[in-house]
Amino acid sequence: MRVIIAGNKTDDTENIKKYLKEEGYNIVAEVSDGFDAIKVCRQHNPDVILMELEIPLLDGICVSKIINNEDIAGAVVFLLKDYNRYVIEKIKMVGARGCIFNPIDKNYIISTLEFARYTGKIYREIKKEKDNIEKKFEDRKVIDKAKGILMLNERLTEDEAYSKIRKYSMEKRVSMREIAEFIVISN
């Protein structure tokens, strides 16, 4: 697992680093501020970024929003000093996949990161599938609109209009949506 650690160098982060290395995890980068956290996530797209909530330049909440919006890390896990219901609600809202509290325990850290990676992977797969379905739906809307135009202007049946779009698509080696957009724009 590829991990980025973002936060101040403390005994806790050093212990975490030691535990992760003992388990064979690859610590891709260690950074001390929010700006660098985003920068290294963009470069390395880690499985997990383990981040303190309060880090310089951009706080963990802002960093998590950006990471999740840009999909540049599999999961965000926060390192928290202690339990605070308000903070937990905030980090849930920005898409964090977990949090680790003091005192630091090796098994707790490893299991939290493993679950975070797993749920992050599932989330990415579902999001990819959702995006694909949305794209197909949008394609279908444009193609249906183009079919309607062809049916009206050329007095074709729906099947004939679809076949015409498909034929042009194959001849020009472009997607049916591109042909459909051309038909819609040129009408």
Indicate where each model-derived feature is located:
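Two-component/phosphorelay signaling modules centered on CheY-like receiver
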Residues: 7-29
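Short amphipathic alpha-helix used as the core "switch/output" element in two-component signaling
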Residues: 61-72
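Active-site residues of response regulator receiver
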Residues: 52-53
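As written
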Residues: 46, 60, 91-97
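Acidic catalytic/metal-coordinating carboxylates
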Residues: 33, 59-62
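C-terminal output/effector regions of signal-responsive regulators
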Residues: 131-187
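Acidic, metal-coordinating helix/loop segments flanking the phosphotransfer/catalytic sites
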Residues: 32-48
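C-terminal output helix
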Residues: 104-113
